[in-house]
Amino acid sequence: MNIAKFCIRHKVTTLLAVIMIAVFGVVYTTQLQMALLPNIEYPAAYVYCYYNGAGPEDIEQLVTRPLESAIMSVPGVDSVTSSSADSISTIQIMYVENTDVDIAATKLREKFDALSLPDGCGSPVILNINVSEMMPSAIVGLLGDDLAALQQQAENVVAPALERIDGVASVSVSGGVERQITVTLDAQRAAGYGLSTSYITQILQAENLLYPAGEVYNGSQKLSVTTDAQLSTVDEVANINIPLQTGGTVRLGEVADVAFETSDRDAIAAMDGTPGIILQVSKRSGANEVKTAEAVVAAMEELAAKDGSIHYAIPYVASEYINVAVDAALEGIILGVVLAALVVWLFLRRGGATMTIAVSMPVCILAVFVLMYVCDLTLNMMSLGGIAMGVGMIVDNSIIVLENIYRWASEGHDRMTSCVEGTKEVTLSLTASTLTTVAVFLPLGLTGGIAGQIFKDFCLTIAFLILGSLAVAVTLVPLLCYFLLDESKVHLDALQRAQKGGRRAQKLMDWYVKKLDYYVHHLKRGVLVSVALVAVFLAACLNTKMVLLPEMDEGMVTVTVSMPIGSKVEQAAAMAERVAAIAEETIPELASYYYTADSGQSASLVLNLTDKGERDRSATDIANALRDATYDVAGCEITCSAYDMGAMMGGSGVSVNITGEDYTTLKMIADDLTAQIAAIPGAVDVSSTVAEQVPQVKVTADRQACSQYGLTAYSVAAAVRSGLTGTTATTVTIDNKEVDVVVRGDGRAEESLDALRSMAISTPTGGSVPLGSIADVSVVMSPQTITRYNQSRQVTISGDAADGDTSAMAKSIRAILAGYTLPGGYTAELAGGYTEMMENFSDLGLALIVSVGLVYFVLASQFESFVMPVIIMMILPIAFAGALFALPLTGKDLSMISLVSLIMLAGTVVNASIVLVDYIKQRRDRGETREEAILHACPLRIRPVLMTTLTTILALVPTALGMTGKMNEMMSDMGTTMIAGMLVSTVITLLFTPVYYCVIDDLTHHRERRKAQKPAAAQSKP
């Protein structure tokens, strides 16, 4: 049964169904979760393991190598990159595609539990990467001068309150100081009693316990027995009696200074110059980021109102960014709807027609919100971007049906006939064009890597829109036309006036018919002109630079301050403060800043800029200016860059990985290549992971000498570590808070090498021996950081391009590597964000090829012809070339977004060709010649073609102009290329699709004639 006829005859049912969809759409829109980005799970994880006091080589040997061996035995691991530095091993794991990272993490924990890591080494921490959750939901700064009090306030009051919020996964605290009980051993007194730090540590552990002893009966009642010997005050610790090897005891306070004090600072934080503590609030997976962030703000306001001592600031809250982005995207969608409806009114000059379109578009969008809720999608930049990009497309089907209904009515048919037959006549071409458009999104949504995850929501929403538009066009539009169509006013003269639109429109139509007639009768010239256009367009964009994602001005500049080895955390913080002062002097757009110095070797500074509309410079320009302003700052290495989501989605810049075993050789190669890469014009922030080797003290135990005193290499190493670094012996509870008890030497051994050699090492017999008598204490050169790749040592050179053109920079680096002779056993290859970009480009290129193939398949199935799809798709090369031509004209780069827009064009620009070719075929079936059919069909179809093109283009204008959100640069590139491709393809379709039709028609007839001539020639032979 005809769908349009069914809907008109069942008006009430149809309208109630539409109303129900609209109501559900409104309800579900308010229940959809909002996020900045889709859930992007990178197939990677990080492993961190701390071993305080160990140097890079010790970390590599004792921690990194065992962890690497365990990791490589886990199924699904593709590559392992590790970094061994002072006190920490950092390992990046890359999994093969489609690996379940949660299951892999469980297997990693099982492997790690079976390892025997050194005493004092922390447990490995596994962190899976989720790009959408890498940024915290909120950053809270507690301000004040008493850092110990702030630390207690943060840990006892603020952090617990924030962790109780529904949706909060964790709250990390940095920048404060911890209180601890420090037992500082007097070396001379301890040696006199034959005491060592390790022995005192054992006694403290034995004296501080809560031990279950069993059960006893009190009559018929069974009671549990617990031995309680817990320490709870500093005096109790100081008064512990230490048994001596020679008999008797000595009070701990007599051989050591026992004090309740703050620990050494391992992190410093400040906001706008005011010292404080930084709390990073992370949401749990699946939680509503906006509600979570807003709840954090509300909780802080409530805490401050209850406790006047809480002074805080919130430099970052995700809800502000997301709300602004979502609101702007929705405004862009509404504006697109209005502009599309305006086009309909300008062409048809009918209030009923305009109202039909104005009603059908919101119904489609509300239906999409229902499907988004069902499919558990979020309102994010990509899903809203899909709606914004599809607003113009959803009206295309309705316009074609509407225009055809009006044409039937203008020919004198009644309302029922006009609505039913007018819809039926174009249903085939509508279905074909809709399926081709949807088909292109299938391979895009199934693309692997980051590209597939980024565009999954985008593809689903736009596919929902387009399929919904087809349903609305063949059901709701004919029904609304049946209600709103006024037969008395829709007569031929009125329609002709609307169609001609005055003298200027008639002149344009006459010009079009004249050109069309010319090219139809001069096919070779038409083909040559179209080929020349493709060549010109492609030649103009040959020098377009390539980037992974368009630069997104998010209003933040990040600065990394790298300090020399051995620097204290206070020095790193002071340098960060100095850079912040320079920023305050040179950047008028600076709104606020905060920094954290988490180790003595680096500090991270974040500059928050004023809103984009309030400044003339981009975040990248400001970062470049700050880089120049800090160029002369001595004593550290400063890296400045605009905060870029693209870097989080795959890195940025270009890297060179050099692999080999000998560190000295690696350093030599890296130094040579770093100098050459830094000399590339436009190269900035060029550095390598190799650094100057620094002196390190190495203690090598003499096993024979140790055995004479009853010592082992391990007991000597433990004694040296305890004397220099200190050992956490136990924990005590003071004021309901666990406090570490740290045993350490008095610091004399740290003063010089001779003092270290003189350190007294206690023996099992109660005596002591100088360290220098049982071990060799010498100075050796050691690297600051040791990097490994797949269990081989590696050095990485990284850099970026000042203008972002990493493709040109990579080309220059390739030339350098090609001319560089490497020693045997060493390799150097490109890596970094550039290789990630090329992999994603390759995936999208394959998706484009598959999309074109699917378009052909759909068209061939729809028209039951192998030839007609070729005619229709001849427009694609010119559309692609025209879209790329727009990039250099508008100052944009070739990015992953640009390639996605080409894939979209593959399914959209053919729609006009489908309408033309289908109608030409219909007229030829009615008996017209080829030329007559073309010259009659094309002018009649020019209005729906122009209407659909203009509605799509105007609906994309807000996106192209950057009116769809705070990070509008991403969708702006897509809007620009789509508009350019649509403009070029429409003009070419109207002029040259008939040419291609004639050429292929001639070739088909020529082949048929040759086939017919062969049997005739065979029969004529004697």
Name each region found by the language model.
Residues M1-M34, K424-V426, R497-P550, L607, ...:
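Signature of alpha-helical transmembrane segments and their immediate interfacial
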Residues F6, L37, A45-Y48, T90, ...:
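Extracytoplasmic/periplasmic membrane-proximal domains and adjacent transmembrane bundles
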Residues V12, I19-G55, D113-G120, I165, ...:
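Transmembrane helices with small-residue packing motifs
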Residues G25-T30, A35, Y46, V338-R407, ...:
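Hydrophobic transmembrane alpha-helices and their membrane-interface caps
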Residues M34-A45, T81-S87, C121-G144, S172-E178, ...:
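Flexible hinge/switch segments at interdomain interfaces of large molecular machines
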Residues I59-V131, Q188-L209, Q230, Q571-M649, ...:
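Solvent-exposed, membrane-proximal periplasmic/extracellular interface segments of envelope transport
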Residues I322, V326, L402, R407-L435, ...:
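Helix-loop junctions and hydrophobic alpha-helical segments within the transmembrane domains
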Residues V391-I405, V426-L446, Q453-A498, L605, ...:
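Transmembrane alpha-helices and their membrane-interface boundaries in multi-pass membrane transporters
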